[in-house]
Amino acid sequence: MDLGIRGRVALVTGAARSLGKADALALAAEGCRIAILDLNAEGAEETAKEIATGGGTARGYGCDIREGVDVGRVVTAVERDLGPVDICVNNAGFIYTVAQLKDMKDEDWALNLAVNLTGTYLITKAVFPGMRERRWGRIVVMASIAGLMGGFGQTAYATTKLGVIGFAKSVALEGARYNVTCNAIAPGIIAPNASLSPLFERMVKRVAMQREGQPEDVANAIAFLCSERAGYITGAVLPITGGMDLFTF
């Protein structure tokens, strides 16, 4: 199925590895020109090279999405190198340390907010005006099932993920009349995170399908939401959980 986005410029944050990399590869397969942003500049360049080796067009950029000046610098470079940004996938996120509220360190709370929420805001703010002016844009933010359900020991992480859902819905309202959509993805347990700790192993047992998801499960949904075929979908929250959010006996 042709998604109708060949030649579009797609910016993907946190795309040096894992889920973000899968997002970038899926969009590249649809013919998008890809800007790979990551705090790990070398990893971003490696992902870009992999796309180029497969016949696509991509550039890698080191970027700290917590810093507005750095975001502005990189977005300017992307538009110089590849063209105006049509698609923005806010994948970058902080892999939290599980801690109950009574034990949480203030710096962990601040880091969750800075990466998961402020970073999403800064990147989106940088590309949104151009999308609005050109009357076409697709924005996806990475939430989590934790943002919808909460989680024991996940106060900081879940708070930021619910926050980006509210952000996505508000941006969707602002962009609607300009053909700029904004949607949120709420993944459940996605490999390789499921292998990080015994906590994830226990959580997989709550999944109705009794298995973890793969990065491609999320990336394929994101590619669709970024396409011409999803032009009437905005302000939505799409759980990709294998039924983790369902009540099972």
Indicate where each model-derived feature is located.
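Short C-terminal tail/terminal secondary-structure segment
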Residues: D2, I95-V98, M149, A223, ...
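Alpha-helical segment proximal to the catalytic Tyr-Lys
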Residues: P129, L173-E174, G231
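Short, small/polar-rich loop/turn modules that mediate ligand/substrate recognition or access, typified
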Residues: A176, T181, I233-G235
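Active-site helix of classical SDR
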Residues: T124, T160, A168
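Residue(s) in the substrate-gating loop at a strand-loop-helix junction
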Residues: S144
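The beta1-alpha1 cofactor-binding region of Rossmann-like NAD(H)/NADP(H)-dependent oxidoreductases
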Residues: A41-E42, G62-V74, D106, E216-D217
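Substrate-binding pocket helix/loop in short-chain dehydrogenase/reductase
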Residues: A99-L101, K105-L113, M203
